Structure formats: structure tokens, C-alpha cells
């Protein structure tokens, strides 16, 4: 697959991208390098991995990171219940050593995302989502796996990759990532989309929604994001939800009343709702609200 073919595949997925993003994805894929994507929550980092899986016709294997994540949840664990049952059934077995060996065979091994991705016969897209939420110890373990594409399980031995996954790591920058991890990866930073890109996303994902309404929603979201009072900036997914909600109500014009009724699809906490009300009281200047004043 060349760069133009990759772009065509992404177009088929109705994914809006720029040349830089497409080029970085293509080169990382060709070199077999993991790709680290940073950016604020909701800018579409996870979507990149989903689109690549669809474009490459590969399975998407996702590891959602969180504080306290360890190898047993990310790599593998043993099916203790099944092992216990087997021990009970074979209580009178003569060859205890053989029984012990069998208990630590594939039959009792539960694959978690990392092991699944390297044992897969066909290459997968491995999404390691929000790596910044995991601790530094897990990051160091992950670095070893990404460097060697193999893993050692004490009871089994070293398992080498059957295929090399295309690895996408995302980070909201909750904590700094190690320089060692950064060196290992290609890097991409994704900003919130500008007005033109957001409108293109709305048109691509919601082609049935009135074009004028899409433009008003895109402009309103741009203004909400640039408003310093708003604590939680609307994500792209929330932009799409909002436009879909307005459309479901048969609304074709983003009036102050429509904005008030549907704000819960784009603003997700009480403080931001209150800030929106305060802005409206002074005359809302979002999207289709220009010129509307009410007290």
C-alpha cells in the first residue's frame, strides 16, 4: 500500500485528515514504528487507530490504561478457576509433575490485549489508549515489549511475535512520558479542528443534517472552545451528538431557545451550563444566535 492508497482508504472511512497526519501514519506503518499521539481529550486521537484498523482491514485490539494497570491485566493471567477445577478432577493423578506442567499450558492462559496482539497470526492494530494514566513502571514494561516484540512468561518461556502490530499510543498529557518511550515512537500532536475541518467532519459523518445547521453548530462549538470560562471544551464526538440531537428535534436554526434545550449534548457540567446562561443573558453570539437578545 502506498501513501495515495492509504489516503483513499481513509476517504472511504469518511475520515477528515490533513497531509501531515496521513504522511506520519504511512511512514510509521512502513517502518513498523509505534505512533504516539498527544492532544487534549476529545480531539480524535482514538479515532486514528479505529480508522487505521478499518483502512488496513485489521482487527483493532484496545488496551485502556488506568492508574494501577499491571501486567496481569495488560498481558496475560492464568485461569485460576479452571486450574483449580482441573486439580480437583485429577486429585489422584500419579504424575504430579505432568499435571503441574499441564496447568500452565495454553489451555489455561488468558490472553490480555498485549499478548493477543503479538500472538495473532494476522497483524492487528494495537491501541494503547491514555498511556499517561498508567504509571512509570508499566510504561517501562511496555517499552521492553515494543522494543523486542517478545515477552517472557515465567511458566511458559519467551513468546515471540507471530506478527508485528501497528501500535498507536494516545496521551492526554496528564503526566510527562519518558524520553525513552518518545524516542521509540513516531509522534503526532492533534489540535481541536478549526471551523473548516469541523464542518467537514459534520458533513462527512452526518450527511443528512441540514448544511446551514451544521455550519451554525461548527461555529458555536468553536466559540465555546475559545471561551475561557468553559471548563470542559466540547469534543468532536460531542459536536456530532449535538448536531444529531438538533436534527432529531427537527431544528434547522440554532436559536437561543434551541441552544438552551440541547446544551446538555455539548456541555457536560453544571458550571459550563451556568456560564452559557450568563453569556446568553448578555446576548448569545454562538452560531445562529447572532442578533438575538433576551433577558
PLM feature segments, named:
Residues 1-295:
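C-terminal regulatory/interaction module of P-loop NTP-utilizing enzymes
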Amino acid at each position: 500500500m502506498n501513501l495515495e492508497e492509504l489516503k483513499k482508504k481513509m476517504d472511504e472511512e469518511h475520515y477528515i485528515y490533513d497531509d501531515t497526519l496521513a504522511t506520519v501514519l504511512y511512514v510509521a506503518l512502513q517502518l513498523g514504528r509505534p505512533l504516539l499521539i498527544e492532544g487534549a481529550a476529545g480531539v480524535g486521537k482514538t479515532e486514528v487507530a479505529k480508522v487505521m484498523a478499518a483502512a488496513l482491514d485489521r482487527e483493532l485490539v484496545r488496551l485502556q490504561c488506568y492508574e494501577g494497570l499491571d501486567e496481569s491485566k495488560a498481558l496475560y493471567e492464568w485461569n485460576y478457576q479452571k486450574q483449580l477445577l482441573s486439580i480437583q478432577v485429577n486429585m489422584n493423578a500419579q504424575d504430579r509433575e505432568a499435571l503441574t506442567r499441564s496447568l500452565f499450558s495454553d489451555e489455561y492462559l488468558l490472553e490480555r490485549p498485549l499478548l493477543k496482539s503479538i500472538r495473532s497470526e494476522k497483524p492487528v492494530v494495537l491501541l494503547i489508549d491514555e498511556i499517561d494514566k498508567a504509571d512509570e513502571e508499566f510504561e517501562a514494561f511496555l517499552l521492553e515489549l515494543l522494543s523486542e516484540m517478545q515477552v517472557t512468561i515465567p511458566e511458559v518461556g519467551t513468546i515471540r511475535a507471530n506478527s508485528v502490530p501497528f501500535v498507536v499510543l494516545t496521551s492526554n498529557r496528564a503526566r510527562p512520558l519518558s524520553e525513552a518511550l518518545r524516542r521509540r515512537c513516531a509522534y503526532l500532536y492533534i489540535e481541536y479542528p478549526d471551523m473548516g475541518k469541523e464542518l467537514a467532519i459534520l458533513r462527512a459523518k452526518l450527511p443528512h443534517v441540514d448544511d446551514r445547521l451544521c455550519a451554525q453548530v461548527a461555529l458555536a462549538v468553536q466559540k465555546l472552545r475559545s471561551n475561557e470560562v468553559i471548563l470542559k471544551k466540547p469534543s468532536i464526538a460531542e459536536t456530532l451528538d449535538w448536531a444529531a440531537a438538533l436534527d432529531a428535534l427537527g431544528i434547522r436554526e440554532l436559536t437561543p431557545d434551541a441552544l438552551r434545550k440541547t446544551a446538555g449534548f455539548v456541555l457536560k457540567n453544571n458550571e459550563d451550563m451556568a456560564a452559557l446562561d450568563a453569556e446568553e443573558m448578555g446576548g448569545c453570539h454562538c452560531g445562529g444566535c447572532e442578533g438575538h437578545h433576551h433577558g
